[in-house]
């Protein structure tokens, strides 16, 4: 079997090599000759998968090592009889920790306590649900908005977006991009929402760029609207708005979900799905793939307060590093994608074991995603 895999999927060449002949390709420019000979295609969100790409090929299976599927025409794949697999939740923890890193940095810079803020979460799926649980574990009040889940009768204290706009200090977006329908998310943050948003609010977008009307946001910021803005995704990509980047507080190159664990989960999930599809018993072990982290263990004494959490969070991942790197190269041809392709081995909080003399603090850290254990003395 001939298997094409995106060159930025970690461990993909070795894993899929167990099942066939592997060729790595650039996701934004898959060579037509390679595609013509492929039996399977493994992609990320940068590849649009539809009839224009695959019609006439012999591809029988597509896997996307991403949680979202708005880059895939699933209806066309089904009609063409092509198998399909996605990696739900693969990078959810990474995005949650990106949001925490950004909020803890803003709290330090602006002199507020995160526990004193109300965070409005728009989209309460794999990412939003995990974010809610971690924020609540840290004592932060959350407001939840997810109309499709509310209509489906899912348990939760669901609120309309207007309530979040009025009451939440932070609005963080974790929805798919949907262009039509009653619950379309395209330009969910538009000129009207920005006008209604009280001064001093924080907006975070780490889902899809077009959920926020970037032109309207730039106009609001240039007009003096006092907002703090964190953008990991842009409209469009990779040719993001340089004037908007200059105005936001944190800007990064669509890397919120780019932990080594998150990317490896995406690869292993689609590998397992394809292996089952072709009738193989081969399965991937995430733990066996991951290398030791740069910092494996740290010992703390005393209470685990917000400052301690900020230091621990930023020891593992400090969002300012990615902000600095994007600003350094923004506007240079190919550099947005180069940052993503050559992204360093960022780890998740679970890679760090915190030893503490505070048993209550150890429990809290475990709820937040760290390894933690008490010590005496």
From Swiss-Prot:
Compartments reported by the entry = Cytoplasm
Q: In which pathway does it act?
A: Cofactor biosynthesis; pyridoxine 5'-phosphate biosynthesis; pyridoxine 5'-phosphate from D-erythrose 4-phosphate: step 2/5
Residues involved in substrate binding: 45, 66, 258
Q: Disulfide connectivity?
A: none
Give the transmembrane ranges: none
One biological process term in Gene Ontology: pyridoxine biosynthetic process
Sequence positions that bind NAD(+): 146, 175, 232, 257
Its Gene Ontology cellular component terms are:
cytosol
| Keyword vocabulary terms for this entry | Cytoplasm, NAD, Oxidoreductase, Pyridoxine biosynthesis
> GO terms for molecular function, please?
4-phosphoerythronate dehydrogenase activity; NAD binding; protein dimerization activity
Name the active site residues.
208, 237, 254 (proton donor)
Q: How would you classify this enzyme at the top EC level? A: oxidoreductase
- The Enzyme Commission number assigned here is 1.1.1.290
Q: Does the keyword NAD apply?
A: yes
What's the domain of life for this entry?
Bacteria
Q: Which family does it belong to?
A: Belongs to the D-isomer specific 2-hydroxyacid dehydrogenase family. PdxB subfamily.
Q: What does this protein do?
A: Catalyzes the oxidation of erythronate-4-phosphate to 3-hydroxy-2-oxo-4-phosphonooxybutanoate.
Spell out the subunit comment: Homodimer.
Instruction: Please identify the protein, giving its name as recorded.
Output: Erythronate-4-phosphate dehydrogenase
Q: What organism is listed for this UniProt entry?
A: Sodalis glossinidius (strain morsitans)
């Amino acid at each position: 079997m001939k298997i094409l895999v995106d060159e930025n999927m970690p461990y993909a060449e070795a894993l899929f090599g167990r099942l066939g002949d592997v060729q790595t390709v650039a996701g934004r420019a898959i060579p037509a000759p390679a595609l013509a000979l492929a039996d399977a295609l493994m992609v990320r969100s940068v590849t649009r998968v539809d009839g224009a790409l695959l019609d006439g090929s012999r591809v029988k299976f597509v896997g996307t090592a991403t949680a979202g599927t708005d880059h895939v025409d699933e209806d066309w794949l089904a009609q063409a009889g092509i198998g399909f697999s996605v990696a739900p939740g693969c990078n959810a923890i990474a995005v949650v920790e990106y949001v925490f890193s950004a909020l803890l940095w803003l709290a330090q810079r602006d002199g507020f306590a995160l526990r004193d803020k109300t965070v409005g979460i728009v989209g309460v799926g794999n990412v939003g649900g995990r974010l809610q649980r971690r924020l609540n574990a840290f004592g932060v009040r959350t407001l939840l908005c997810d109309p499709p889940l509310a209509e489906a009768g899912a348990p939760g204290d669901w609120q309309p977006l207007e309530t979040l706009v009025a009451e939440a200090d932070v609005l963080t977006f974790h929805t798919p991009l949907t262009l039509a329908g009653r619950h379309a998310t395209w330009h969910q943050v538009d000129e009207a929402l920005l006008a209604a948003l009280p001064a001093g609010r924080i907006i975070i977008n780490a889902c899809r760029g077009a959920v926020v009307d970037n032109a309207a946001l730039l106009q609001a910021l240039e007009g003096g609207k006092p907002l703090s803005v964190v953008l990991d995704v842009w409209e469009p990509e990779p040719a993001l708005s340089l004037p908007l980047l200059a105005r936001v507080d944190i800007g990064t190159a669509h890397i919120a979900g780019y932990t080594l664990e998150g990317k490896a989960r995406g690869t292993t999930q689609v590998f397992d799905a394809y292996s089952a599809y072709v009738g193989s018993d081969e399965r991937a072990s995430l733990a066996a793939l991951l290398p030791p982290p740069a910092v494996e263990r740290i010992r703390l004494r005393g209470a685990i307060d917000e400052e301690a959490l900020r230091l621990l969070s930023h020891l593992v991942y400090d969002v300012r590093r990615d902000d600095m790197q994007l600003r350094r190269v923004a506007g240079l041809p190919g550099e947005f994608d180069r940052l993503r392709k050559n992204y360093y081995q960022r780890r998740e909080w679970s890679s760090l074991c915190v030893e503490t003399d505070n048993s209550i603090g150890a429990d809290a850290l475990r709820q937040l995603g760290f390894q933690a254990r008490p010590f005496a003395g």
